Swiss-Prot record:
Name listed for the protein in its UniProt record: Der GTPase-activating protein YihI
Ranges where the record places region Disordered: 1-83, 150-169
Species, as recorded: Photorhabdus laumondii subsp. laumondii (strain DSM 15139 / CIP 105565 / TT01) (Photorhabdus luminescens subsp. laumondii)
Keyword Lyase belongs to the record: no
Biased composition (Basic and acidic residues): 21-30, 51-66, 150-161
One Pfam family hit: YihI
Biased segments, Basic residues type: 31-40
Subunit organization: Interacts with Der.
Lineage of the organism: Bacteria, Pseudomonadati, Pseudomonadota, Gammaproteobacteria, Enterobacterales
Record key words, sorted: GTPase activation, Ribosome biogenesis
NCBIfam families: PRK05244.1-1
UniProt GO BP: ribosome biogenesis
Family in the record: Belongs to the YihI family.
Disulfide bonds: none
């Protein structure tokens, strides 16, 4: 054995440890009691309804006292009844692009708002948004159907005239 390396001292046995006196034991007991006293829920918390903070506000909370709505057979041999199926809500049939375009072009509200704009009156944000969305939809439908505005045709004719002048010179 190397004389430089010494063994670690052995652990002190339980019998040789210093015994605690009555004051120390009482202080530890009071501390344990104080900690134990503050465990659990506050008084009166057993039947409180849960607050809506934890759950999303868009969804209405179900009452936990209400049970299932499934009918229960009262006679042992009776077959269970079939659940009632809710009728499906029919969606409105989609209009063809031609019908939708005709409907938008004959829109009285749009005509009245466009007349107000031509007269120089100002529109509210809602009215302006309605005009913009309706005109955008009309443009999309005209593109889909391959209909071009007269203004575009005139611009194309002007470009053709310019090209002919350039080629002729």
């Amino acid at each position: 054995m190397n004389p430089l390396k010494k063994k670690a001292p052995a652990k002190v046995s339980a019998s040789k440890q210093k015994r605690k006196n009555r004051e120390e034991l009482n202080a530890e007991g009071r501390a344990r009691k104080r900690e134990k006293k503050h465990r659990g829920n506050p008084p009166g918390n057993r039947n409180q309804e849960q607050s809506g903070d934890k759950h999303p506000s868009g969804k209405q909370q179900r009452d936990p006292r209400l049970g299932s709505k499934v009918p229960v057979p009262l006679i042992v041999g009776e077959q269970p009844t079939k659940p009632v199926v809710a009728n499906k809500v029919e969606t409105k049939p989609r209009l063809s692009p031609q019908e939708e375009l005709a409907m938008l072009e004959n829109d009285d509200r749009l005509d009245a708002l466009l007349e107000r704009l031509e007269n120089g009156e100002s529109l509210s944000k809602e009215e302006h948004a309605y005009v913009d969305t309706t005109l955008d939809r009309i443009d999309a439908l005209m593109e889909e159907l391959g209909i071009k505005l007269d203004e575009e045709e005139r611009e194309e004719e002007k470009q053709d005239d310019i090209m002919q002048l350039l080629k002729g010179n």
